[in-house]
């Protein structure tokens, strides 16, 4: 009986994760206290950081909250940091937490409008190149004001819906009949080649849209969680953030669109497949049927969602309130005027963001270890000892490499904290801090499209129910992202090295942005325990 119970405990630990992964995490937890006792807290801190990055890289085996959280709890228990320092880090980044909790939930209630829009794009454009550019541009524009995860979720929902409709018809059923679109055994031979082509078509659209979320997400204060985190540290508001990033982000955006068009023209890296004409006909027939079924209540809800979306853009652009509170107003407006008043219907909106919000708190625990043990001090000192014109590109590359294998929010949190400490110690001046903050933000956002580990939206796509249906594996995603990674990363690096500083000086001279003081930074505490 006891042996059976023991096996049950082992099986329950980290659930469906592979046995080797479970043993690895247990080994980490056993080794860390021994290393702290024998080799000291600094070595243990570096080991913990490597272990935490491992949990992020293995996110497909097990969501990083549990293994990363166990490591963070142990770090506090063995004295690598304290609960007070962790709380200090969380409080200092409360606006980021509110963004994740309220803004993502708010956009959930605008999904019908977004679905309607993407459906119209998909059916209204016949040219695959134009369609790909529109999907990429629409995802970029939406991600500049909304949350990249939510935009990706909408694109997934649209593509899943269309895949399910065609798969149902290809299996000899009508729109109204129930059907398992994960089972290919019922697909008629006549439709098999069209189904293969349709899968390829959807894969390419999904990747264009996912990259679009990264292209737009880097541009504005709310596009990615780390943007707000960095803006809070620097004291930048919506307009200033956009202008400071523009010397890098706008050229990257243009080159991203050029890459999108080139990939569709050339048909390389798995792109170029058009939607089969038979499939398009079925989709159009289905859309017309849905339009006929739309009630006045449904249409009124779309109008309310559109008005709420306009308020969202105005609220963010004018900095009417902190980003998270603007998100809360979106929830209240969108639900009040569309009749969503039951608690369980509201609760569903928060499911998407809360796991990542919890994971972000674990990030801050690891950042607290880095701060207390001063792990990155030698790295930062080395980069700051370089010639001034080399510092920005050096930070861009360091962030880019780490963000390709780890989570970019975590990487940004670590580096902006360390550069902030350097400013408070008078090792750099405030203008240099602002330039380095731009390099850190773009370095964590742009090269991170290389793998699903870096971009939360990519990981979300890879782990969705749609990915296996359209045969989108980890390896295929990396290959399809490769041309984007190369073009966008090199463009960002060149702009950081050559254009960022003179463009920023031009913005200062013309009064578009203002010089900040060191005291502006100190409003968001950076020194652990103070």
Swiss-Prot record:
The chain crosses the membrane at residues 13-33, 67-87, 90-110, 138-158, 205-225, 245-265, 302-333, 350-370, 449-469, 477-497. It comes from the Bacteria. One of its GO terms (molecular function) is sodium:proton antiporter activity. It catalyses: 2 Na(+)(in) + 3 H(+)(out) = 2 Na(+)(out) + 3 H(+)(in). One of its GO terms (cellular component) is plasma membrane. Its main location: membrane. Keywords: Antiport, Cell inner membrane, Cell membrane, Ion transport, Membrane, Sodium, Sodium transport, Transmembrane, Transmembrane helix, Transport. It is found in: Cell inner membrane. The keyword Transmembrane applies. Pfam families: NhaB (PF06450). It is a multi-pass membrane protein. Belongs to the NhaB Na(+)/H(+) (TC 2.A.34) antiporter family. Na(+)/H(+) antiporter that extrudes sodium in exchange for external protons. This is Na(+)/H(+) antiporter NhaB. It comes from Alcanivorax borkumensis (strain ATCC 700651 / DSM 11573 / NCIMB 13689 / SK2). The gene is nhaB.
């Amino acid at each position: 009986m006891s042996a059976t119970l023991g096996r049950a405990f082992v099986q329950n630990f980290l659930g469906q994760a592979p046995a080797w992964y479970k043993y690895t995490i247990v080994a980490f937890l056993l080794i860390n206290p021994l290393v702290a006792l024998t080799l000291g807290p600094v070595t243990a801190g570096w080991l913990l950081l490597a272990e935490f990055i491992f949990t992020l890289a293995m996110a497909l085996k097990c969501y990083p909250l549990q293994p990363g959280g166990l490591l963070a709890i142990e770090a506090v228990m063995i004295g690598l940091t304290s609960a007070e320092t962790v709380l200090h880090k969380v409080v200092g980044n409360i606006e980021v937490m509110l963004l994740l909790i309220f803004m993502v939930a708010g956009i959930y209630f605008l999904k019908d409008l977004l679905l309607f829009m993407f459906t119209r794009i998909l059916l209204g454009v016949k040219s695959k190149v134009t369609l790909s550019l529109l999907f990429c541009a629409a995802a970029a524009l939406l991600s500049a004001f909304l949350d990249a995860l939510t935009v990706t979720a909408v694109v997934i929902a649209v593509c899943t819906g269309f895949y399910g409709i065609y798969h149902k018809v290809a299996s000899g059923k009508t729109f109204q009949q129930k059907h398992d679109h994960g089972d290919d055994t019922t697909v008629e031979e006549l439709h098999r080649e069209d189904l293969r082509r349709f899968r390829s078509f959807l894969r390419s659209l999904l990747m264009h849209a996912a990259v679009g979320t990264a292209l737009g997400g880097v541009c504005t204060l709310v596009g990615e969680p780390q943007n707000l985190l960095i803006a809070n540290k620097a004291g930048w508001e919506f307009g200033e953030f956009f202008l400071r990033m523009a010397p890098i982000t706008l050229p990257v955006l243009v080159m991203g669109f050029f890459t999108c068009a080139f990939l569709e023209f050339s048909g390389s890296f798995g792109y170029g497949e058009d939607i089969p004409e038979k499939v398009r006909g079925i989709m159009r027939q289905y859309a017309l049927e849905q339009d006929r079924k739309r009630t006045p209540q449904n249409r009124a809800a779309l109008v309310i969602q559109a008005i709420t979306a306009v308020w969202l853009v105005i609220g963010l652009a004018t900095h009417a309130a902190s980003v998270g509170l603007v998100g809360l107003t979106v929830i209240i407006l969108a639900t009040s005027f569309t009749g969503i008043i039951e608690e369980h219907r509201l609760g569903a909106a928060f499911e998407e963001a809360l796991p990542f919000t919890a994971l972000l708190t674990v990030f801050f625990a690891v950042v607290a270890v880095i701060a207390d043990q001063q792990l990155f001090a030698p790295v930062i000192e080395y980069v700051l000892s370089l010639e001034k014109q080399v510092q920005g590109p050096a930070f861009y590359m360091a962030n880019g490499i780490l963000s390709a294998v780890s989570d970019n929010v975590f990487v940004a949190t670590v580096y902006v904290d360390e550069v902030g400490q350097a400013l408070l110690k008078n090792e750099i001046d405030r203008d240099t801090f602002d330039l380095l903050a731009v390099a850190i933000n773009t370095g964590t956002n742009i090269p991170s499209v290389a793998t699903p580990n870096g971009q939360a939206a990519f990981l979300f796509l890879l782990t969705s129910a749609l990915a296996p249906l359209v045969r989108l594996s980890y390896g295929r995603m990396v290959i399809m992202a490769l041309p984007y990674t190369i073009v966008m990363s090199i463009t960002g690096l060149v702009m950081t090295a050559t254009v960022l500083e003179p463009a920023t000086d031009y913005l200062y001279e013309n009064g578009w942005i203002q010089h900040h003081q060191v005291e502006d930074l100190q409003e968001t505490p950076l020194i652990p325990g103070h």
